[in-house]
Amino acid sequence: MDVSSDTREISVGGNDNIVKIYDISNLESPILKFTLKHQAAVKAIAYCPWMPSLLVTGAGSKDRKIRFWHTKTGTLIDSIETEGQITSLIWSKSCKQLVASFGFSTPDVHDNDKSVLLQVYSYPDKRTVTRIIASTSMRALSSSISSNYDTIVLAISDQSVRLYNIWKASHNFSCGSFEGGIFGSNIIDLDEGIHDSFEVIR
């Protein structure tokens, strides 16, 4: 479950393989806006802190996809195929990146005793920035981010807690102040007030 940075929406995932997006502008009368289907239970949900209508979701072992949604329209913008069960997703507040933690994963191609525990992606190009490999016996159960937004805290299946310094929190993005390409659609970008520089057609 997560709430958008403008506090107008809440998204809830469950074992029914569905994410439900509610308009909570009026807390006394929440309105169901969209149901987003997945192929497995959805545990990982995160609204983008610098673009309130950008939602990312991650599902279990039978799905293994990170999906990006435009919550004003319910549009699936993009997705990333991963190597395992997605247990958490966290956006950076200092750069356009996203970190995913993994539970049950496919063993690493170079070492069958290792698998991906944590992976950082850039957005919107979805490039892998960093990946942390661990023993296949280790699974990330859940994660959180430090109060200064630079360290990821993982709860591990071996009853340990691990801290990874991922980002330098030197500055924070402000909502909506970005170039085009965030949503992968010129129409959605225009609706969000995001404009690319281009020559006027006369």
Where are these regions (language model features)?
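Residue position within the beta-strands of beta-propeller blades
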Residues: 12, 56-57, 100, 154
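Loop/turn segments within WD40 beta-propeller blades
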Residues: 2-8, 46-52, 90-96, 144-149
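Short, flexible, glycine-rich and Lys/Arg-enriched loop motifs at helix boundaries
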Residues: 58-62, 103
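Per-blade loop-tip surfaces of WD-repeat and WD-like beta-propellers in eukaryotic adaptors/scaffolds
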Residues: 4-8, 15-42, 48-53, 61-63, ...
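Terminal intrinsically disordered, low-complexity extensions flanking WD-repeat/beta-propeller proteins
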Residues: 76, 81-87, 92-97, 101-202
